[in-house]
Curated annotation (Swiss-Prot):
The protein's name in its UniProt record: Protein translocase subunit SecY
Cellular compartments annotated: Cell membrane
Pfam families attached to this UniProt entry: SecY
Keywords linked to the UniProt accession: Cell membrane, Membrane, Protein transport, Translocation, Transmembrane, Transmembrane helix, Transport
Record membrane topology: Multi-pass membrane protein
Biological process, per Gene Ontology: intracellular protein transmembrane transport; protein targeting; protein transport by the Sec complex
Residue spans crossing the bilayer: 18-38, 68-88, 117-137, 147-167, 174-194, 217-237, 270-290, 308-328, 368-388, 389-409
Quaternary organization: Component of the Sec protein translocase complex. Heterotrimer consisting of SecY, SecE and SecG subunits. The heterotrimers can form oligomers, although 1 heterotrimer is thought to be able to translocate proteins. Interacts with the ribosome. Interacts with SecDF, and other proteins may be involved. Interacts with SecA.
Highest rank taxon of the organism: Bacteria
Native source species: Staphylococcus epidermidis (strain ATCC 35984 / DSM 28319 / BCRC 17069 / CCUG 31568 / BM 3577 / RP62A)
Family of the protein in this entry: Belongs to the SecY/SEC61-alpha family.
Function (record text): The central subunit of the protein translocation channel SecYEG. Consists of two halves formed by TMs 1-5 and 6-10. These two domains form a lateral gate at the front which open onto the bilayer between TMs 2 and 7, and are clamped together by SecE at the back. The channel is closed by both a pore ring composed of hydrophobic SecY resides and a short helix (helix 2A) on the extracellular side of the membrane which forms a plug. The plug probably moves laterally to allow the channel to open. The ring and the pore may move independently.
Source taxonomy: Bacteria, Bacillati, Bacillota, Bacilli, Bacillales
Length: 430
């Protein structure tokens, strides 16, 4: 492991990309401390302040929401917009479906529309959030309560989201890994110390016998280890489908090529978890604009992962998004076609349509197992807080852990691939 990190920093171009990525994430973190204009940063020191904040948004945004900073909206409007755009491509909007089939050019068009939609959504949610938080904090959040003040706050928060989208694009283009994922990753890690502090306080406060408190902490450590092992397994486990070559001349390539087709147990990675949590935020938008409407509050209460119905919905969403994105990441038809063109086949399976059906069947089974594991890891901390009396601060711990591990694994793979590429170029004398 140490030698791997040494390789990262001894390769100049990769080292520069790492430093660039870290610099962008530092800018993100600094922005979480810059308060939006016209708000009172001390308002969240109100006794009810921490309860009024949406813990998920605050965690993903690196604590920006509880400070009501310029990045208070975070990157979630973009993720929500991405969900909607992905669904609209499923023959709902013919133009989007057409773009999805146009390759790189089509993806650029879809990405542009996604960004515009995210900006509109961020503006709408910013206005509602300013009203809701000011009401919840008994009018202490907004200093000057005027239409212009609310509009200014909404514009600034929307600009903050737009800047984070741009920042993510810069990391993706000039840095290491997926920029949006790394921003969420950095946000979760930056809130970890405060979450641990809250957990420790909730465990020790009011305890005459500290042995029980230490037992809970030990239990949390063991649970974290088990969840980490489980997360790595579900994100990295593969099913190897054996491949054989029909042409004799292809035998010369066997020494340099894998003779199996690897399919991940969870091809979608942590995207289903992120999208499922983002989906839960949509009904809460109703309460931003209808704070006194009982029907809106009932919908928001139902769309809460900690409620009984909410947990079921959360699991169903994770499984649904896992299947959806598994077939986005893996195209059985294209895979079968490529195998046929290469003169290779799965033993006992005819090339072409039969191979496509076989890969589809295997992918369905793998995704079922992977999505169940994914959902279990995500909801176990919620169950622990609900039925075992553990503090609320660890409620989204499973979701956060999955995202952190998933992003870390993918970033490490990206770094290793870039280092290997540079080393091969070096051997080639370039």
């Amino acid at each position: 492991m140490f030698q791997t990190f040494v390789r990262f920093f001894t390769t100049k171009e990769v080292r520069n990309k790492i430093f660039f990525t870290l610099a962008m994430l530092v800018i993100f973190k600094i922005g979480t401390y810059i308060p939006a204009p016209g708000v009172n940063p001390e308002a969240f020191n109100h006794p009810q302040g921490s309860q009024g904040a949406t813990e998920l948004l605050n965690t993903f945004g690196g604590g920006a929401l509880k400070r009501f900073s310029i990045f208070a909206m975070g990157i979630m409007p973009y993720i929500t917009a991405s969900i909607v755009m992905q669904l609209l491509q499923m023959d709902i909007v013919p133009k989007f479906t057409e773009w999805a089939k146009q390759g790189e050019m089509g993806r650029r068009k879809i990405n542009n529309v996604t960004r515009y939609f995210a900006i509109i959504l961020a503006f709408i949610q910013s206005i509602g959030m300013a009203f809701q938080f000011n009401n919840y904090l008994k009018g202490q959040l907004i200093i000057e309560k005027s239409v212009m003040s609310y509009l200014l706050i909404a514009v600034v928060l929307t600009a903050g989201t737009a800047f984070l989208i741009w920042l993510g694009d810069q990391i993706t283009q000039f840095g290491v890994g997926n920029g949006i994922s790394l921003i969420i990753f950095a946000g979760i890690l930056s809130t970890l110390p405060s979450s641990l502090e809250q957990f420790a306080q909730s465990v020790f406060v009011g305890q005459d016998d500290t042995s029980l408190a230490w037992l809970k902490i030990l239990g949390l450590i063991v649970a974290l280890i088990l969840l980490t092992v489980g997360a790595i397994f579900v994100l990295e486990a593969k099913r190897k489908i054996p491949i054989q070559y029909a042409k004799k001349q292809s035998a010369q390539r066997l020494g340099s090529q894998a003779t199996y087709l690897p399919l991940k147990v969870n091809s979608a990675g942590v995207i289903p978890v992120i999208f499922a949590m983002a989906f839960f935020l949509l009904p809460r938008t109703l309460t931003l604009f209808f704070p006194k409407a009982e029907w809106a509050q009932n919908i928001a209460d139902t769309a809460n992962p900690s409620s009984n119905i909410g947990m079921i919905i959360y699991v169903v969403l994770i499984i649904a998004f896992a299947y959806f994105y598994a077939f986005v990441q893996v195209n059985p038809e294209k895979m079968a076609d490529n195998l046929k063109k290469q003169g290779s086949y799965v033993p006992g399976i005819r090339p072409g349509e039969q191979t496509k059906k076989y890969i589809t069947k295997v992918l369905y089974r793998l995704t079922f197992v992977g999505s169940i594991f994914l959902a279990a890891i995500a909801i176990l901390p919620i169950i622990a807080t609900k039925f075992m009396g553990l503090p609320q601060s660890i409620q989204i711990g499973g979701t956060s852990l999955l995202i952190v591990i998933g992003v870390a694994i993918e970033t490490m793979k990206t770094l290793e691939a870039q280092v290997t590429q540079k080393e091969y170029k070096g051997f080639g004398g370039r």
